[in-house]
């Protein structure tokens, strides 16, 4: 199965999702433009609603009610993808990752939800900041889009 997310906002780009079956990892690839230099939190959020910009996307997709964590952590939100790294505004930021928790299949699938690029680095739930266990203290939302099935 394949899906696509067209990111818009201060940051824009295309992110593709591909998964051969429910038992296989999810491949996430694509690019972003106009992303400031540094690390930026990258998460699937609970709602596929961008009617009020990225704020209407809700919180991180967390159907299992876990604390926020790194993509490879045992305890994490389903929607936690960690950070993406940008070389700066004038560069293309490539995205290429695999995830073993997120899926395009089953009751916790991400189809119809939103993908959000954040202003700040995701601390992966590892700091004492009050937002660390809920958002990774990753700040505001630079861009977002709705994940949709594609050919």
UniProtKB/Swiss-Prot annotation:
Disulfide bonds join 54-144. The keyword Zinc applies. Zn(2+) binds at residues 60, 68, 77, 80. Gene3D superfamilies: Superoxide dismutase, copper/zinc binding domain. This is Putative superoxide dismutase [Cu-Zn]. Belongs to the Cu-Zn superoxide dismutase family. Keywords: Antioxidant, Copper, Disulfide bond, Late protein, Metal-binding, Oxidoreductase, Zinc. It catalyses: 2 superoxide + 2 H(+) = H2O2 + O2. Nonessential for normal virus replication. Could be either non-functional or with a low activity. Cu cation binds at residues 43, 45, 60, 118. GO terms for molecular function: copper ion binding; superoxide dismutase activity. The keyword Disulfide bond applies. PANTHER family: SUPEROXIDE DISMUTASE CU-ZN -RELATED. PROSITE patterns: SOD_CU_ZN_1, SOD_CU_ZN_2. Its cofactor is Cu cation; Zn(2+). It comes from the Viruses. InterPro entries: SOD-like_Cu/Zn_dom_sf, SOD_Cu/Zn_/chaperone, SOD_Cu/Zn_BS, SOD_Cu_Zn_dom. Pfam families: Sod_Cu. Binds 1 copper ion per subunit. Its EC number is 1.15.1.1. It is an enzyme of class 1 (oxidoreductase).
